[in-house]
Amino acid sequence: MVANGHFASNGEGQDSGSYEHGVQVIDEDKEFNPNVSRYLTYENVTPAGFNYHLISVFGSQSTGKSTLLNHLFGTHFSVMSETERRQTTKGIWLSKNKRVESSKDRDPQMKMADNILVMDVEGTDGRERGEDQDFERKSALFALATSEVLIVNIWEHQVGLYQGANMGLLKTVFEVNLELFLKDNKSTPRSLLFFVIRDFVGTTPLQNLQNTLLQDLNRIWSSLSKPAGLENSTINDYFDFAFAGLPHKNFQPEKFVDEVQKLSTRFRNAHRDPNNVDSRGTGSIEGGIFLPEYHRRIPADGFAVYAEGVWDQIVNNKDLDLPTQQELLAQFRCDEISREALVAFDEAISPFESKQAEAVQAGSPQVLGGLGPVMRNARMNAVKNFDAEASRYHKRVYQMKKSELEEKIDTRLKALFLGQLNAAHRSGVQDFSESVSAAVKAGQKRGASYDFAEIVSRERQLAIEKFEKEARSTLVEDAPWSNYQQELSLYQKDLERISGQLRRDEMRRLATRVERWVRSRLGESVDLEFNALGSGRGGSGAPEFGDKPSENTIWDRVWTIFVDTVLDAERRFTERASSFDASLDEVDVGLWRLRRKSWGVLRAKIEEEVMEGNLLLKLRENFEDKFRYDDAGVPRIWRPTDDIESVYTQARESTLTLIPLLARFRLAETNAPPPLDKWIGHTPSSATPADEEDLTPIGGVDEDEGKSLEEEMTMIGEAKKQDLIVRFKKTADGVYVEAKRSAIGGITQVPLYFYGLLLALGWNEIMAVLRNPAYFFLLFVCAIGAYVTYQLNLWGPIIKMTEAASHQALEEGKRRLRDFLEASDTGRQAMAMSGARNATEEHEMSNLNRKSGERGGQKYRGEDVADDDDVDDDF
């Protein structure tokens, strides 16, 4: 026996050199070699898919099977030594076709098929195993389950014999074939039995030998016990047959080599010729011997796993179910391929998953740039790689595993997709809100009117386009979850919600501006009306044109001013609200709130006017105007002969009538409160609790308030009214006393003896004046001037003019003195020292005055001034 050290037997070290000539698939102890897949990888057969062919050789021990394979396929199987007659091939060995063909000696169409794998099966009828035929049966079953072509190696002189022609082995092959067919009832697997007749001398024609073998095979087939339904089946239903003869290797070596060369050309792909139909009704085989129907349809990368599973079933004496084995292989390989595909998928997707998870955990989801292309490429590559490897396996299993892979991939991609849309949703809503607010502020800064509805519509369209662009860029075509319509609908609803909120906020800001405008206008107008109460005369207190307004109709005028102002505000509010695309319900609620707020403004203003201090001041002014001035508005100069008591009583009683008049808001025309409840109207049905929470309850309007309209219109209570009457009377009494004192003051001011003393002491001067015509005339003129001045009541203006002239003269003197002092050095130094001292004192006094002013005026600067400055120019 020639032993070759470049075969990898079961259990040997697995270096690359050990696979040079082949691998032992099953050893003599019936153990399967787990390194078969490594050998196929070493020979680069694994990537071939279905583009490979498997041949097994059968025959009696020591009949030259290995020698035939070595010459035919260039393999290096161990062969028997010429000097010994014993078993050389133990178990089953596998090697790839190593035959080197010369292009100049071979037609390219006659080239051997690619990736031919040859299995050298242990010979039968050997003395080493004796009567133990278990391995023969198991190896035959294994070869038939895996191989396309079964080469039967026999000698010419054995044709016609039973044992010598391996008819016993062939009977075993036929039996296990039927066994396999029973399990695979969906198809009829076919194989090729290739009889190679050795030491063929040609005396008996090859056709006769072929006929003899076919007769023996048919006889064996007929003798088999067939399962139900297959009683009439023939051997040709499962097998095709081919025959070849080879000369004696030792006696005709050159011819043997030539015939082997010719025989090798038959090991190529074949097809059936439909124009040349055989006895079975199928086309004859043309070309080579490898028909597609012989192939077991096991991809090369799964052959090792499949073969191991088949052998495990065989060696454990279990029923061999090839379809089940193919499905198990498909499941195993598809799972492996799926895991490999997911590795590359993980490398591409995991970074984005981590970024998205971190952003969500931080509470600020962010849109991941470049996610869409990565998702599409990762999914496409994973499915493509899976299809390339797994599509060659069992179709049902392949489809099932592909669906599982796509489900795993799509589950993760869908999570990324939804996370991306969620981030785009949040950022889009935020950007939309900020953009609308920025556009509104820009319009307010420009001072021009802006269309809020147009701003919202434009920004909303931009936000939707941005969201759809991001969603489309993240879509994965053909994925079942690649539909963002639901998310888009939710996004649009959120934009609508935000738009509504922004519109309501803008409506509230508009209402606030209108309220400020109403407050400003009402404040001015009501101030004028109440200030008119401070003038009881028809002169300075009366309007510039027309008569003095009647005090009894003050509430009518206030109500008219109020209604006109609010109607104007409503018109402005409605015009501005139309640019917000506000609904009728929102406008109704806004107008209803405006009327209620405006009434609150008016009532607050009235309460301010009728405060005790303000009202007493106006009552005093009203009384003084009526008491100190006549009906023409001319000041009264009280004389002792005037009826001061009558004028005082009339003025006081007239002023006292204002207190009950101002105590209640009543219209003079109806002597009833104004129809405030009808004017404000009922609460709109669309009003929400939020619309009412900041409103002040109004008596007679709000039923839950428990206060009537009459009570709402009461501005001064009874106790306060009595107090005002008492205090006013005291004030009026003081004015009366002052007037009375001034009337009698001219008489009692100069004593009578003073005139006698003046006459006695000034007699000489009096006589000198009377005797001198010039002095007398001057005295006469002065007396006439004094009388006229007195009658015209011009002494006051003359005194004031005199004081002003003297003050101006004093200032002019100071200025001239200052100029004089500045002309000398001594004067300048004195002025500098005096100026520094005065500046220090003025600074201290200024600080005191400022602090006092800040405490007293802070409230008005924070309220009245701010309100006036904030009033929108549009209103």
UniProtKB/Swiss-Prot annotation:
Origin species: Blastomyces gilchristii (strain SLH14081)
Enzyme class, broadest EC rank: hydrolase
GO cellular component entries: endoplasmic reticulum membrane
GO molecular function list: GTP binding; GTPase activity
Biological processes annotated in GO: endoplasmic reticulum membrane fusion
Function comment: Cooperates with the reticulon proteins and tubule-shaping DP1 family proteins to generate and maintain the structure of the tubular endoplasmic reticulum network. Has GTPase activity, which is required for its function in ER organization.
Residue intervals annotated with topology Lumenal: 771-773
Coiled coil segments of this chain: 482-506
Residue intervals passing through the bilayer: 750-770, 774-794
Record's keyword terms, sorted: Coiled coil, Endoplasmic reticulum, GTP-binding, Hydrolase, Membrane, Nucleotide-binding, Transmembrane, Transmembrane helix
EC number: 3.6.5.-
PANTHER family per UniProt: PROTEIN SEY1
Domain of life: Eukaryota
Span list, region Disordered: 676-704, 831-875
Membrane topology: Multi-pass membrane protein
Name the record gives this protein: Protein SEY1
Subcellular location, record wording: Endoplasmic reticulum membrane
Cytoplasmic side: 1-749, 795-875
Residues binding GTP, per UniProt: 59-66
Domain GB1/RHD3-type G: 49-307
